[in-house]
Structures are given as structure tokens and as C-alpha cells.
């Protein structure tokens, strides 16, 4: 059956028409064999929109010279998308992850879906491998489905099995699964990781992402027992913790014994761990990240990071001022879901300071990341009423249910000591709290 479906990337791009809406898989599953040659059609095409999420490869079609032909709409910005945004051929799609696919389908009709799959099994089923954040819904809605069949991708289970009869065309691909570099943890990361780990108990269920702080939290959990996983992203550090026997899922109240995720991204060790592993379930993002589903996990712990937080608890996690940097992703989904769970907890972590470029002088200068007022134009990813526990290297501020006056005091208490007096002065001057 599959031989008649196999075509070259050059043949596949012939199906693209001007004004088409193309959707690509997330991250590793972006379909880079197809996208690597797409620029060859630039002279024939106008206004082709490509919806993507966390694209990893810098490819020719992204160059400014092709922006009249190809425009990218992204659910979550990567360094590639930040560069394209700056040059004028990319834009952000505001979303909460659990509704990203449905809301996009309200706005567009996908003409072509491009992604990655494994070779079919003996029953004719391929696996969508590293993700189903929105992929299966887009496949079901698309006029034409083109998948790059790649034996190097892990065969995973969950909602990712797709019969080859549902695929219009296959591209025979043989590149390695795109990998992320391992992120070293700093002294600040490790301090924050230890603080958060001290509030995680045996049997807790964890949601965690990637980066220095999340990695440090995972590394601080090796003394725990019977942890579970219900997470948006499955990472290399989580796989290592599972291989060490710390993650068993034996005490989970939902999907006992299973590590539930919506996408997988990390190193080759992670991909090998997930390959044909029945303990890993890759499920639809609308299910995994829906707050009411997350809340069914007793003892759910959510860990997210932010770029800036004001003294009332508003988190600007995806932009630097008005300029898009990353995305909302599942931050609001997981923070809300965890707090609705029995004995659930949500952590927002950040360094107390950052080195920020002065727009006037061009020099980098230290700035407090806990501020009286967010940077003008900053996008609020998590509203203050959804913030539970905030962590810096100076401690933990428990904000859930607290008044603004209490929040100001608690957040100043975990700010860098050099900025605490000014923060209190600003809070009074601006009327955030009363008194002089």
C-alpha cells in the first residue's frame, strides 16, 4: 500500500498553491525534508501561510527575499521565529495550549498538513512519534496530508497511531531526530531547584518543562519515590529520572503507571527511552492540558518560569516589553489545573535579577525581575489570580489567597536585597498599597 504513496520532497511541494494554509508538526516533527525545498516554489507562489510551533531548523524559505511567498504564523516562538518576526515574515498566534488547535481551526481551513511519522507496523499503522499537541486534529481537518516517514523517529503510543490509509503522500526521509543541547544548571538554578524540590513529596505528580531551572528541579528529586508525570513536554531529564526508578506512576489517580505527555523534545537518550515504551502515553494537547483533566491528578505539581512579575503577581512570561519572545504555551493551563487538584501546587520560578540591554545606551545593566510595574507593553501570560507560589534564589512567596498588601510584602522578601527598598517605595508611590 505505501509504495504507491511515496514521493520525493520536490514532488510534494508541487501540491502547494498560492494562498494555501499549511500546518506543520511541532518542533522535531516540522517536516524538514518538505520545508527544505519549499523555497524552490517561491516564484510561483504568493501569500502561503505556514502555521507552526517551535520550529527548530533555519531553512531557505524563511529568508526575507521570500516573504511575499511564505509567511509564518507561530503558536510558540523559537529563536528561528524571533528572527523571522524581526524581519517581518512571522507573527504570533495568541493561545492557551489546550485550545490552540480548535481556535486555529476556527480561523483557518488547513489545505496541507506536513509532519513526521514512523514506518507502518504490520497492521498498517504509523506513529506520529514525538507529538500530538495539535497534530492529529490538523491531520483530520486538512485537505491533503503529507508525512515524512522516518525510521529514526521513536514509535510512541497514545493518540498518535494513524492508519496509513489516512495519509495521502509519504516522503521517505532518513535524517536524525532533531535534538536539543543539554542545558547546564547554574548555582542559581540549583538553589531554586532545591527550594521547589523541598515542597515535592513522594507520590506527587509532576509537570515540568525545559531550561536551567526545570532541569535543576528534576536533578533535586532523586531522593523521592513513586513520582508520576502528567506534563505538556517530556524532557531528557525526566527520562533519566524515570530510568533511575524515581518515576513509577504507582500512586497516580489518573493513568496510573503511565507518563502522560503531549510532545517529546530533548536528546537521543530521550528518544531511545520513548521508543516502543508502553509507559509513555502521547495524548492530544486538548486533553493533556485541559485544566479539568489536570485537576483529576491528586497531588499535581506544576512548574513554570516567567520573565518578569509585578508586585501583585502578574506574570509576563512570553514577551520582553511588547516584543514576543516565546509563547503562553501551557502555563495558564497547568497553573490552573494544578491548583484545582486535590493537594495541588503551582510554582512560578525566576531569577531575582537579569542583565538587560539599555535601549538608549546599548549597555547591559542589572535589573530586578520583580517589579512594581511590568515593562510597558509586556504581555501578561498568567494573571495574578492564578498565581500560587513564586520562587527565586532568595526563597518562596506563597501568594494563593493573599491580599495585595501581603503579596507586595512576600514578593519583596524574595527580591534581590539591593532592590527591596526601592520596590517598597514604588509600591507606595504608585498606590499599589496605601501609606507613605
Roles of regions detected by a PLM:
Residues 1-436:
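Conserved alpha/beta enzyme-core scaffold
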